[in-house]
Each structure stands twice: as C-alpha cells, then as structure tokens.
C-alpha cells in the first residue's frame, strides 16, 4: 500500500512526519514530532476506511481501549481523529526492537532465547497483563511481534492492541492471555515463530529445567492449568541453579549450518543451542545461562571415563600444588569479600545504555539536540575558561569545524549536569523554556515589586538555585550584561520563572509586620539551592536585631527599603543589629549553599528606646 503521508508534511497542523515505519496489522505507521508537546516523538497509524467498514470499527475499538489505559509498559494513547476517509491513531513512540526482530537476529546466529531470559520476559510482562485484566481487557495477541523491548530500560512494552477486547463472559476468556504468554515463551525458546503442538516434542529440543518445562506445559494447555496468582508465585520460586553438571565441562556442540530460513541446524538435524564458556572464576554452583546438548549417552560415558582418568593423574601428581593453589584462592577470595561493598556485583552500564538514557531524558524535556548541545558547550566554556569568541574560531585540523570542548569524560559530566538542571524546572517553566519564551529577565520585576521586594532580593533567590545546579558559572558573572547573551542565561530565566511562582504563591515568601509585638520568630527547612524571602515593616528610629540560627552553609541578605545601600548580601554572618531609620519594607532573603536540606530559625527583634543602654 502506498504511504498516504509524505516526509516533512505537517498533519493536522501539529504532527511533523519524520519517517515511514511500515505497515502493521491495521494501517500505515509513521514516526512524527508532536509540535504541541515540545517536539516529542510519537507514532501515527493511518487507516483508510469508508464509514461502517469492519477494519475502521476495529481501529476505533483499539483507540477506545487505549484511551482507557495508562501504564508505563503500554504505548499509551495520545489522540484519535479522522480527516476525510482516513482515521489516525497517535501513540507514544517506543524506541527499541520487537521481540520478533530480536528472535530473527538470534536465529541468524543459530540461537534462541535462554530459559533465564524467557523467565525474566514472563515476569516483566505479568504486571502489565495483570493491569489489563483488572480493567477487564484481554490483549488477545501476546506474541513476539506485538511486544517491543524498550531500549532505555530493557522492559517489554505492549504496542499492538488490534485484537484487544473487553471480557464478554465466555468461560476461559480471562485466561486467553495466559495461553498467549506460553506461546510467546515457546517461540522465544525454540525459534519457532508459529509453534504448533505437540508441545512436549518442541520443548525437548531446548535446555530447560524440569520446573519451567512443566509450568510452560500448564500455560500451553487449553484452558491453561494455572491462574495469574499461581503463575506469579511459580515464576518467582523457580530454582536458579537448575543445570546438570555436564555444563561444567564446557562441552561444545556441533557448529550449526545455516538453512534457507535462517535457522541453524546441527549435523544431527536438531536445532542447536548456544554453549556456555565459563571463566576460571566460575564454580560448580555458579549460575549457568545455557546447557549444551550431548549426542547420546554413549558419548557422555566415554568422555566421562576420559575425564576421570585425567583427574586421577592430576590428583596423583599435583595434590600438593593444588592445595597451595586452593589456599591462595581462598585467601584472595576472603580479601576480596572484605573489600567489596554491597552492590559491587552490579554490572556497569554500557556506553550505548547511558546514551539511550540521556536521549530519553532529553526527549522528555522536549528540547532539540542542537539546543541541548549549545547549553552543554556553554557550560564547558565556563568550566574551562574559554572565551565565547574563541569558541567560534575554526580549527584547521578539523576541516573548519568549531573547536571541540573538553575531554569525553568532561562532556559526559556536563551533559548530566545540564540535564539535572533542566529536570529541576517545573512543567510550566520547562514549557516556557522549550518555547523560548523566557525573554528579558527584567520583565518580571514589576510583579516582584508588587510583593514589596526589589530585583536584588529576587536575583539572590534565582542565583542561589542556578549556582547549585550549574556551579561552573561564577556568581559574580550572573549579574553582568554579557551573561544575559549566553545560552545558559536561558536556564537562569527558566529558574527565575519558577522562583517568581514560588513567591507569588507564598510557598517561599511571607510579608511580616511588628503590630503588637517586639519580636518575630520564624523557622523552616531549606532544600539545596533553595531560598525564602521576607518583606518586613520595621518602625524607624529603633534599634533592630536579627539572628539566624543555621549551619554555616546558610546565607542571608538584608536590604533597606530605598536606595542602593546594602546591610548584608549573601552573608555567612548570621547576626546583625543597628538602627532602621527608613520607613517602608525591609527585605530579608535566606538561601542555602549546602548539598543537603538544612533547618533554620530566624529571630527578628525591635529594641525599644527605653530598653537601650545609655
């Protein structure tokens, strides 16, 4: 079928078509950018169907079901609309590969999925299937082709709801997806995309523990001989060390030959299975992923006698050396255990996994790659002390490309730093930032003044937050006109957006007065980079004192109502006393440069003239 949308087309004045993904069971599918949601990627399925057409009704039914669902392992609904005779379904874009494609790649190598992988696949699918069944929805097509492995976290995600429907009350209908889960598992284990019974024969061709084999046979029965709670318990209680000791010998199966359909075969005509190569550190109790097949009992017995003979010779000649080696190994193991901390055995993420996580975080913010790179480069320029004009110079050794900034490690660290800063913004500030609406910082000052605060108090609050997330920019530079032209100034503006909101909703602002008292006592907790502002009316010609009880990482500013005079500004000195001879609102700002929350108490006192010492 000819694609109905062209690349670069803007559909419904909103969706910018990026790529034709192909055709699924109902229609053509495209990758697009949602220009109303920070250019987030999404998929659009298009179906051309006349009114009342059966396919069109199925398409609408799928959209209605998706509309009612909200789960992180479902390609969630965004919009459904019609234009002329075409129906459009918009869903979240899931970056990854279908399990059908993953299985196809394995088959080209003469391999399939291991038992441990399929166990995990089943366990990870159970929460989303259970969620569907709570909604009285049967997915109806649990198969490798309708499930994707999401790149960012490796979780299986349901993407095709073509055959989904609400329960109609037919006996066994609530267990249809259990049967589908069993069919999907056997497909991944055997490489048979459309497996057929007898199931025992299929399962005999792969290395499985007896417990998992029996569980699969219960799923594959119709109706399934296991319910949802029992399946969950059985999967969680399967033994972890299930393989026979023959796997320890590291026997190698026959190298598979490639067949026309891409599935490898051994010389015996049976499907091959990947072998296990254990490292010298592996022990007999180590977790083994796959079991090799041995052709017949005779071969096993023969090889066992040979092995036993070799072991006897080794025992006779090397017992002393063996004991010494064991002692050394035990000592080394004990030393290693003594040094290791909990979690040391967690595998490090690959570069690809890290990059995918970073991309997912950036996409969630709705910021283009080019703009994000500009922010990162600006951060590195501040960190490395590089002048912006120098950044624009051309490097003759890179064919005219701009100078690259920092080492790969510095670039990665700055990427994380900028992401953390942007993710600290509220949704409204993020939208304002993504749409380049932050503008001139001075546009907010009239609203700040309505709170009886000046721009310097407001800037103290914003600067504290900005410096917490982006410390490579010196606080002294934040007020300079040159900084307002830098890319990172846009982040400052977005943080100012949030800071103003926190003042106006009075979550970080309070107006105070000494009506019938000479003393005010305040207290609170400051999160890292956070601040509070107070507008205080203090009678003139009186002695006034303030005392802040807080860790040294707290900072305080104290400004008079008028003029450029500064009493305290971002000061680590937490105590002050003196005359307050101006009428109006004095401004108090408390901020934190700590890396953890800190508590504070603030005491404000008026000392009457009669109580002052002569």
UniProtKB/Swiss-Prot annotation:
In its keyword annotation, does this UniProt entry include Iron-sulfur? no
The residues annotated as site (Defective ATP-binding) are: 44
- Which terms in the Gene Ontology molecular function aspect does this entry carry? ATP binding; protein serine/threonine kinase activity
Give one Pfam hit by family name: Pkinase
- List the Gene3D superfamilies hit by this protein, alphabetically: Phosphorylase Kinase, domain 1, Transferase(Phosphotransferase) domain 1
Summarize where ATP binds, as residue positions.
21-29
Please give the SMART domains that the UniProt record associates with this protein: S_TKc
Q: Where is this region: Disordered?
A: 256-284
Reading the lineage from the top rank, the first entry is Bacteria
Please list the residue ranges that the record marks as compositionally biased, kind Polar residues. Answer: 256-269
- Residues in domain Protein kinase? 15-404
Q: Which UniProt keywords apply?
A: ATP-binding, Nucleotide-binding
Is Lipoprotein among the key words of this record? no
Spell out the InterPro entries in the cross-references. Answer: Kinase-like_dom_sf, Prot_kinase_dom
Query: What family is reported?
Result: Belongs to the protein kinase superfamily. Ser/Thr protein kinase family.
Q: What does this protein do?
A: Lacks protein kinase activity.
Q: What is this protein called?
A: Serine/threonine-protein kinase-like protein E
Q: What is the lineage of its organism?
A: Bacteria, Bacillati, Cyanobacteriota, Cyanophyceae, Synechococcales
